Curated annotation (Swiss-Prot):
Identification of the protein by name: NADH-quinone oxidoreductase subunit N
Enzymatic class: translocase
Pfam name, any one: Proton_antipo_M
Task of the protein: NDH-1 shuttles electrons from NADH, via FMN and iron-sulfur (Fe-S) centers, to quinones in the respiratory chain. The immediate electron acceptor for the enzyme in this species is believed to be ubiquinone. Couples the redox reaction to proton translocation (for every two electrons transferred, four hydrogen ions are translocated across the cytoplasmic membrane), and thus conserves the redox energy in a proton gradient.
Subcellular location, record wording: Cell inner membrane
Topological type in the membrane: Multi-pass membrane protein
Record-annotated membrane-spanning stretches: 11-31, 37-57, 82-100, 110-130, 164-184, 205-225, 239-259, 268-288, 301-321, 329-349, 372-392, 406-426, 446-466
Entry superkingdom: Bacteria
Record text on subunit structure and interactions: NDH-1 is composed of 14 different subunits. Subunits NuoA, H, J, K, L, M, N constitute the membrane sector of the complex.
Major subcellular location class: membrane
Catalysed reactions, semicolon-separated: a quinone + NADH + 5 H(+)(in) = a quinol + NAD(+) + 4 H(+)(out)
Length: 483
């Protein structure tokens, strides 16, 4: 009985999110349309409750296992979960007005968001291939439905179909890679796979082939080249509220997935997967930055920007050392904050019947609202890596880790591409400050959205000038989880 209680205690945050998701679905059945704000309130309360439980049950420097070693509770999982709660909560604040104006303010929107969050939490704490895959599939199925949520938009339906087909293909590759590793090592437990590899597995060629399939599946989930074909279409076709969710919170789960699989499970094969990640990183930075320059749609531009950011993230992983993993975690945190701000401004400018998703929609924003133009300026500078913003320090950290690992040529390439990539971010600034507005409609938004958006952008500036605290949190999460 004590073992069961211990298992349930370890998974208490997941249980809270699961119960709240089911409660939201039931509540929606009994509420009239004008009372649906209660669904939003209960969703936020569920996130707050899960955050409090995660913080209160956190044990410093203690790694505990549950469900026969299939579930782990360590500093890395706790830090990432807290970041997920925060990001999801902010995302719901940013999107509340947007979804209410588009007949998407329904129980299933909030329930799917919570179920997707549950899948990500399982991925973060998964210590077994089946647990990791179960969390991934729960997340993926929810995202397919969310992309198609706006049923009157044919672009959204098309994007959901593409996402589903390509997602199923990537899941198959992941499963195939896992089955190959199981065939060689005889186990699906991440720690036991690592031990089997340390003792020396006989079929190295089969192992490498399995790693190739795993990297391909992971590359799709991250949106790295050459598995990025879904990113622009899904970002463009999905409702902006859903694009924000896909572009921010889910990347934290993908980061955790890579940590659990590659670092904790397959570190012995680092020399094999390092080269694969290096190729993906270089291609992602190159194609992401070059293609983004040609875009006129803001969502597609940010989609290709995401691809290039994934390339920089992979620099941290291919460094194959503690500094690299810490810098990669720091980078993903910075990326999530930048993405929240960028899409937050887009949602702020949107209104009923109008999607502010073209670059031209930002023309003359400084004349309409100097404050929001200033916030977007900070966000764009951070994405471009201009000091003293958080984006600059994040790029500096991953490139420094890669330099210490001996990838001098790749670091020089990344710096050159960062300078080239700055063009399309500065183009946004030029449109806001030097062009005449095409639309003088007053910008209306809830006060909580305005306050959070302001804090979001200013945080990018503050953390850029004083990044050490966030870096210390990332270092603590990484170093105290790998014992």
């Amino acid at each position: 009985m004590n073992a069961i209680q211990s298992d349930l205690y370890a998974a208490l945050p997941e249980i809270i999110i699961l119960c709240m998701a089911m409660f939201v679905l039931l509540l929606d059945l009994f509420l009239k349309s004008h009372n649906r704000s209660l669904i939003y309130i209960f969703t936020q309360l569920g996130l707050a409750a899960a955050a409090v439980v995660t913080a209160c049950t956190h044990n410093v420097s203690v790694v505990s296992y549950a469900f026969n070693g299939m579930f782990v509770d360590d500093p890395l999982s706790d830090v990432l979960k807290l970041m997920m709660y925060l990001t999801t909560s902010v995302m719901l604040v940013y999107t509340r007005q947007y979804v209410s104006l588009r007949d998407m303010f329904r129980g299933e929107y909030f329930a799917l968001t919570l179920f997707a969050l549950l899948g990500m939490m399982i991925m973060v704490s998964g210590q077994h291939f089946l647990t990791l895959y179960m969390g991934l599939e729960l997340l993926s199925l929810c995202l397919y439905a969310l992309v198609a949520m706006d049923r009157d938009n044919p672009r959204a339906t098309e994007a959901a179909m593409k996402y589903f087909v390509l997602g199923a293909l990537s899941s198959g590759m992941l499963l195939y890679g896992m089955s190959m590793l199981y065939g060689v090592t005889g186990t699906l437990d991440v720690a036991e796979v690592a031990n089997a590899l340390l003792q020396g597995a006989p079929d190295h060629a089969v192992l490498v082939l399995g790693v190739v399939f795993l990297i391909a599946g992971l590359g799709f989930k991250l949106g790295a080249v050459p598995f990025q074909m879904w990113v622009p279409d899904v970002y463009h076709g999905a409702p902006t509220a859903v694009t924000l969710f896909i572009g921010s919170v889910t990347k934290l789960a993908a980061f955790a997935f890579m940590i659990r699989l590659l670092i904790q499970g397959l570190y012995v094969l680092a020399i094999d997967w390092q080269g694969m990640l290096a190729i993906m990183a270089v291609l992602s930075i190159l194609i992401g930055n070059i293609t983004a320059i040609a875009q006129t749609n803001l969502k597609r531009m940010l989609a290709y920007s995401t691809i290039s950011h994934v390339g920089y993230l992979l620099y941290g992983f291919m460094s194959a050392g503690t500094n690299g993993y810490v810098s990669a975690m720091f980078y993903i945190m910075a990326y999530v904050l930048m993405t929240l701000g960028g899409f937050g401004i887009m949602l702020l400018l949107s209104r009923k019947g109008f999607e502010a998703d073209n670059l031209e929609d930002l023309k003359g924003l400084n004349q309409r609202s100097p404050w929001y133009a200033f916030l977007m300026l900070i966000i764009m500078f951070s994405m471009a890596g201009v000091p003293p913003t958080l984006g600059f320090y994040a790029k500096f950290a991953v490139l420094q880790a890669a330099l210490q690992a001996g990838f001098v040529g790749l670091v020089i390439f990344a710096v050159v591409m960062a300078a080239i990539g700055g063009f399309y971010y500065l183009r946004v600034v030029k449109l806001m400050y030097f062009d005449e507005p095409l639309d003088n409609t007053p910008i209306k938004a809830p006060i909580d959205m305005k306050v959070l958006l302001s804090l979001n952008a200013l945080l990018l500036l503050a953390l850029g000038m004083f990044p050490q605290r966030l870096m210390d949190i990332c270092a603590y999460a990484i170093t105290h989880s790998f014992q």
